[in-house]
Amino acid sequence: MKLPQGFRSASIAAGLKSTGALDLTLIENQGPEFKAAAVFTTNKVVAAPVVWSRQVAKGEIVRAVVLNSGGANACTGPQGFADTHMTAEHVGQLLGVSPGEVIVCSTGLIGELLPMSKIIAGLDSIAPVLDDMGLQTSAQAIMTTDSVPKIATAAFDGAEFAGIAKGAGMLAPALATMLSVIMTDAVVSDKAQEIFQRATDRTYNRIDSDGCTSTNDTVLFMASGASGVVVSDHDLEKILMTVCGSLAEQLIADAEGSTKTVAIKVLNASSEKDAVEVGRACARNNLLKAAIFGGDPNWGRVLAAVGTADANMDPLAIDVKLNGVQVCTNSSPDADKSSVNFEARLVEIEIDLKIGSASATIKIGRAHV
């Protein structure tokens, strides 16, 4: 699959995975522009690549990103950071760019040093063969417990967008053992970081699998400007919402042990923040998830979960629909819950707070506990 103009990539099985699968990929932005935006984990324990890449991203110029699976390089002390630095330095030498413009991402087991000789040898092998047809293999190279690669593309007025992502377990709001790279050949404004942050907040940060966040989460956006097509801030946000939204849906569908996809839609909250808080309270509630997994349309557990949220509400005026059936009106019984069918994979929970106009949807990729 082809990358947007200005981008090249290549991948290799460097020997980081015992399976012999692809585990190392290098993506280069050849410009003429090198604008970048990034969002990282909120976990206080962060991997060495995140420490490095946060500093790189502050400059909002990224010329290359190297990603490996098969090892997280997290909780590895000073040597782990030195290894990340070495990786960026080596990529810089191979591509003739500053290491301070190279993002490094790792995913895999925590607490083990990376086999740097294999990474260096792998980079030496793929740097000379970078081309514009490596989207699929780059998506495969970052997989860990994922069962399928995640890819999303979009086009707008002659500009191309393409994204890859990985993440199957530990999915939770505020990123989710997740790596993602989104590329475009469009010309974008200096507000790319602000726009990308909003798109991330409303897509990746509204999915949940098991309530855990990772040490390594990194979502990167790069724009080469190679198409010459100028995309407005408004249109850029819409496109990023589409691409990130598609990747987030794919992550949810492939969450480890997932048997249900649960969409929790909160309506008429006093603010979007409150709507998100209520949705997350339900997404994290083990009693509610147990009911869903057991096929029990127990709307009382929905109300109980809603009540734990730090959000404005009238506890006597909440409506609940389960798969379209209004089982609760004004926090009291309505339609018989026996008319609700939870057999399908998709379960829809609609919570109407009736105190404002804001809304948000949180999606769960694993309904059992």
Regions found by a protein language model. Give the residues of each.
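A structural signal for small-residue-enriched, beta-sheet-centric alpha/beta enzyme cores
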Residues: 1-68, 72-83, 92-366
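Generic structural marker for isolated residues within well-ordered, non-membrane alpha-helices
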Residues: 88
